[in-house]
């Protein structure tokens, strides 16, 4: 399908059903919709495994704007059937209230395909039952490491900005695979308060600018097996007692810059087997007797 406008749709209380599902489509605009379903509210797909790669029709030039998502497993989901690729997608001016997840990208070994050039802006999330953000290349937990090939999925060049969230179970996670890290994500002007923070495992070139993450347990940011991490002007308004704001495990080249942690903490970060560069920071220390 090409050059399609979907506007003013209201879907409510559909059991075990997606709301709107563009698959291998081009030039689609979804706007001014109210969606409350039993499965994902909006799902973008492009075929599955070898058949999807052979057909080779990406889902591209997709705009989602001015929509409200209530309940449903995911607000906007890409995958896991994305073997033909998904590119040039914008999601803006939306509310997610009561969905299991907000923005969710999922794939696994064997799928192949590239998800890239995704922009998410001006989003409000509330009462998210699981994760606000998911970027998961390890959806099939039984898969084993294999050489990079057409079977290898890729997530890259994804940017999220101007997002607020409250009453959230977990801010989210990034999960790459050993042969293909998640690459080139940026988060800017984001404020999230959740029970659990943001966990990043096997990723590179990940950047946070003017971001406030607060979690009720553990550290708001947790990085492992990562490269090229930039934390610029990040903080936690409600840090957990004696927990660092950031933890690094096996991280190569992380930069912490312009971070002003005004709520006192014992340690802004803790690192193990990691290379960390600091610059122009102020971290107010807790006083311990």
Labelled PLM ranges:
Residues 1-12:
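Single conserved hydrophobic/aromatic residue that forms the stacking wall/gate
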Residues 10-289:
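Extracellular/periplasmic carbohydrate-active domains that bind, remodel
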């Amino acid at each position: 399908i090409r050059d399609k406008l979907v506007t003013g749709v209201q879907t409510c209380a559909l059991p075990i059903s997606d709301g709107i599902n563009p698959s291998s489509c081009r030039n689609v605009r979804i706007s001014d919709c109210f969606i409350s379903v039993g499965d994902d509210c909006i799902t973008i797909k492009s075929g599955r495994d070898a058949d999807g790669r052979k057909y080779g029709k990406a889902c591209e030039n997709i705009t989602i704007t001015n929509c409200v998502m209530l309940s449903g497993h995911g607000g906007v989901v890409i995958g896991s059937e994305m073997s033909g690729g998904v590119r040039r997608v914008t999601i803006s001016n939306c509310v997610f209230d009561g969905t299991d997840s907000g923005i969710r990208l999922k794939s696994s070994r064997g799928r192949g395909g590239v998800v890239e050039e995704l922009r998410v802006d001006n989003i409000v999330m509330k009462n998210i039952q699981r994760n606000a953000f998911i970027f998961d290349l390890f959806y099939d937990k039984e898969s084993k490491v294999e050489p990079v090939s057409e079977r290898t999925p890729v997530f890259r060049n994804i940017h999220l900005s101007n997002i607020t969230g409250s009453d959230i179970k977990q801010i989210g996670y990034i999960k790459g695979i050993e042969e293909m890290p998640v690459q080139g994500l940026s988060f800017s002007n984001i404020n999230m308060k959740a029970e659990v923070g943001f966990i990043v495992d096997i990723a590179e070139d990940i950047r946070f600018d003017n971001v406030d993450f607060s979690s009720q347990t553990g550290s708001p940011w947790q990085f492992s097996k990562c490269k090229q991490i930039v934390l610029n002007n990040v903080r936690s308004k409600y840090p957990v007692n004696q927990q660092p704001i950031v933890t690094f495990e096996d991280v190569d080249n992380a930069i912490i810059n312009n971070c002003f942690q005004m709520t006192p903490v014992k340690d802004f970060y803790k690192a193990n087997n990691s290379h960390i560069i600091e610059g122009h920071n102020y971290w107010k220390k807790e006083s311990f007797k």
